[in-house]
Regions:
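N-terminal accessory segment at the very beginning of proteins
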Residues: 1-250, 255-258, 262-271, 282-285, ...
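Second-shell loop/turn segments in exported
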Residues: 255, 297, 362-365
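Active-site-adjacent "subsite" loops/lids of carbohydrate-active enzymes
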Residues: 326-373
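Short secondary-structure boundary/capping segments
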Residues: 38, 270, 297-302, 335-341
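Soluble non-cytosolic domains of exported or imported proteins
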Residues: 260-264, 303, 366-373
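Short acidic, glycine/serine/threonine-rich loops at helix termini
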Residues: 204-206, 294-297, 331-337
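Short, conserved phosphate-binding/catalytic loop or strand-edge motifs used
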Residues: 285-292
């Protein structure tokens, strides 16, 4: 295996895998790997431009004890950006350090250069690629050692009461009442972003951590080291973007119900708040105010004059939040036009994926630029 300094990035190839480690923001590194001939070029969640941060790369030979007991000389390498340093041994196993102290290391149990010698016969790779039939994508698993006494925070919003995610198995997918944000904040002083837009899971076990992407062409993660959680988050938002401050009324009183069936119900509730002298900031009109799914308009039978309703609510100082679903019923006036323009989701075999929920429905393909308009 040969390490190279590729324009300020540490790169190497090993057993059909290309790996690239580079500076990406302050005190941070981005790590990518692929089994393909080249990287995709996608930055995914790393949306913000970053100023070039020159990294210090060291490539050197070191003596290593081989499996037969003999000593051989092999290359190892390191890349440093501010407070974080990544070291790579001759078998491509990565370790990360903050100010010289180990904070994260890949979980590798094989004969090819294990840093930890226990259970080498398990033959567990730190980065495991399993090809999917019929294409160029893989199921990817990336494993790290579990830090003793380490606590893990973040990862989004899940239906559990575990503030510390150590010991949790977390699905990496969006669901109703589940928001997956694959960013982990460690008590050891680092932040880790799994930068792979794929359904999968994250397991923070007591024995090791494991990140899984069920279908991907490459591995991509970002890691930063800092002295406090605040500093970690500052570096994270510098590369992923910072949310604007909420307007004051969005932090006020919201009124919502499953569901208001008519225009008059909504107005009656808002008028009652005004009578009681209670400041109402938002009122939510939830699902099935429409004709059929995909028409994206109010049912005139129950909502005869939406504009007049909104005007009255605005006059009372109440903003209106309207639930809009991406589902399109085959009976919808928009179904055929959307189908003809290729703006509906399809399966990998090209067929429409339908399901029965108050109608035979498909979903708008929000990843299509035209559909988003």
């Amino acid at each position: 295996m040969k390490f190279v300094n590729d324009g300020g990035a540490l790169a190497f190839s090993h057993r059909g895998e290309q790996v690239r480690i580079e500076s990406w923001g302050r005190d941070a590194l981005r790590v990518r790997a692929t089994r393909g001939r080249e990287f995709s070029g996608h930055d995914w969640a790393l949306t913000e431009p970053v100023e070039p941060a020159p990294a210090q790369i060291v490539i050197e030979e070191t003596e290593f004890r081989d499996g037969d007991g003999s000593f051989v000389r092999r290359e190892r390498a390191s890349i440093t950006n501010g407070r974080i340093r990544a070291e790579v041994n001759h078998a491509g196993v990565l370790s990360f350090f903050r100010d010289g102290s180990l904070i994260l290391r890949e979980h590798f149990r094989d004969y090819d250069g294990a840093i930890s010698r226990e259970s080498r016969c398990l033959k567990l790779a730190a980065r495991e690629w399993k090809g999917l039939p019929g294409g160029s994508e893989y199921q990817l698993k990336v494993r790290f050692e579990s830090g003793k006494g380490e606590k893990i925070f973040g990862m989004g919003q899940y239906q559990d009461d575990c503030m510390d995610k150590k010991g949790c198995l977390l699905e990496l997918a969006q669901r109703n009442s589940q928001i997956s944000i694959p960013f982990a904040l460690s008590s050891l002083g680092y932040g880790f972003l799994w930068n792979n837009p794929a359904v999968g899971q994250a397991v923070f076990g007591s024995n090791y951590y494991e990140w899984t992407a069920l279908s991907t062409r490459e591995m991509d993660y970002w890691i930063t080291a800092a002295g406090s959680p605040r500093d970690v988050l500052e570096r994270y938002t510098a590369v992923t973007g910072r949310a604007e401050m909420f307007p004051e009324d969005l932090m006020g009183l919201w009124q919502c119900k499953l569901r208001y069936r008519t225009q008059e119900e909504v107005l009656a509730v808002a008028r009652k708040y005004r009578e009681e002298g209670i400041k109402l900031d938002q009122i939510v009109i939830d699902f099935f105010h429409w004709t059929v799914q995909g028409d994206w308009r109010f049912d005139e039978t129950y909502w005869p004059d939406p504009k007049a309703m909104v005007d009255e609510l605005h006059a009372m100082g109440v903003k209106v939040v309207v639930s809009v679903w991406p589902t399109v019923d085959r009976r919808s006036e928009n179904f055929v036009p959307l189908l003809d323009r290729g703006l509906l989701m399809r399966t990998e075999r090209g067929a429409l994926q339908t399901y029965d929920y108050e109608g035979d429905c498909v979903e708008l393909d929000a990843f299509h630029p035209e559909a988003r308009q």
